[in-house]
Amino acid sequence: MKVLFAGGGTGGHLYPGVAMASELKKVVPGVEISFAGTPAGIEATEVPRLGYPLHLLPVRGLKRGRSLRDLAANVGVLKDFGSSLMQAFSIIRKETPNVVVGTGGYVSAPLLLAAQLSGCKTLIQEQNAFPGVTTRMLARMASEVHLSFAESRKFFGDSKNVFVTGNPAREFPAEPRQACLDFFGLRGDLPTLLVFGGSRGARAINNALLRFCGRLEGKINLIWQTGSLDAERVTAEVSSSSTRWIGPYIQEMGKAYGAADLVLCRAGASSLAELTNLGKPSVLAPYPYAAADHQRHNARALVNAGAAIMIEDTNLADDASLETILDLLGDSERLDRMGHASRSEGYPGAAAELAGRIIALSKS
């Protein structure tokens, strides 16, 4: 059995494919797995590190502006897409995959299209509440389309090939809360706020925390992943203490989640999948410049479910936002309700279920 995963650019489009690949390796002895991506994406370094073959295509994303510069750049983008499509046909002929799985990002488009035109089975896995351009364009020709949010179903009418299976995410073993707090050197008698904005960080979130940090001292525990870009600036102003753990990156994310009563973060699909699988209540600050504003759509899905509240990026440093967070941390009953609502939105078996669908398609 051969499976080709096409997607990347960011971890949010790559790691769902990695999770499905890991599940396939568990249940299909001798399965041959390869990936396709771009030289500029995270997959260029991460996929070889994981030991999978990688095909690189020159495809780029379209500029969304209307300036002459953007229009001129898009001429080159279309040329690169044509070249990538020809390479994709060559990859399909050479690899002869049983199934091509698209996990989003512009790199998935030429591989999915070439596979569909070659008569190869295709599965699209859409992470975001508002489906991406590739998903919307190629869904009708796909063998199956799998969504992460139930509310995304409305974009596909009565299509019989569309299913809601959740977003494959990292799995974390359950650990006692006190043991997790001890790991970070924090007090057991205070509620804990976990804050992160991705591996590079989120400047608006970090700025808000810098403004409020002194007022949080002694009221809550804080686990704060600053990201690599802001680490030096933040640690120059604020240091760790008995109620604060501050660092550029959290290696033991399972322990951070285990300690957390509330999470403040962006609204990327992978983060939300982890939150809902673990049943964590959250305060979401969608990245305002995400393509098609997809993070806002993701956040709205959890807000509508009662699992989260949303704060606009521009309002993060307002006193009202601080009061909202402190009020939540002081209301254990509301946190419990939000946690139950969050868990009801999770799909902890998503990777295994999707691996099963890939296997079924390969045999059909």
Swiss-Prot record:
Its main location: membrane. GO terms for biological process: carbohydrate metabolic process; cell division; cell wall organization; lipid glycosylation; peptidoglycan biosynthetic process; regulation of cell shape. It is found in: Cell inner membrane. The keyword ATP-binding does not apply. It is an enzyme of class 2 (transferase). The keyword Ligase does not apply. Cell wall formation. Catalyzes the transfer of a GlcNAc subunit on undecaprenyl-pyrophosphoryl-MurNAc-pentapeptide (lipid intermediate I) to form undecaprenyl-pyrophosphoryl-MurNAc-(pentapeptide)GlcNAc (lipid intermediate II). UDP-N-acetyl-alpha-D-glucosamine binds at T10, G11, G12, N128, R170, S199, I250, Q295. It catalyses: di-trans,octa-cis-undecaprenyl diphospho-N-acetyl-alpha-D-muramoyl-L-alanyl-D-glutamyl-meso-2,6-diaminopimeloyl-D-alanyl-D-alanine + UDP-N-acetyl-alpha-D-glucosamine = di-trans,octa-cis-undecaprenyl diphospho-[N-acetyl-alpha-D-glucosaminyl-(1->4)]-N-acetyl-alpha-D-muramoyl-L-alanyl-D-glutamyl-meso-2,6-diaminopimeloyl-D-alanyl-D-alanine + UDP + H(+). GO terms for cellular component: plasma membrane. Gene3D superfamilies: Glycogen Phosphorylase B (3.40.50.2000). It holds the Pfam family Glyco_transf_28. This is UDP-N-acetylglucosamine--N-acetylmuramyl-(pentapeptide) pyrophosphoryl-undecaprenol N-acetylglucosamine transferase. Keywords: Cell cycle, Cell division, Cell inner membrane, Cell membrane, Cell shape, Cell wall biogenesis/degradation, Glycosyltransferase, Membrane, Peptidoglycan synthesis, Transferase. Belongs to the glycosyltransferase 28 family. MurG subfamily. Pathway: Cell wall biogenesis; peptidoglycan biosynthesis. It comes from Chlorobaculum parvum (strain DSM 263 / NCIMB 8327). InterPro entries: GlcNAc_MurG (IPR006009), Glyco_trans_28_C (IPR007235), GlycoTrans_28_N (IPR004276). It is a peripheral membrane protein. One of its GO terms (molecular function) is UDP-N-acetyl-D-glucosamine:N-acetylmuramoyl-L-alanyl-D-glutamyl-meso-2,6-diaminopimelyl-D-alanyl-D-alanine-diphosphoundecaprenol 4-beta-N-acetylglucosaminlytransferase activity. Its EC number is 2.4.1.227.
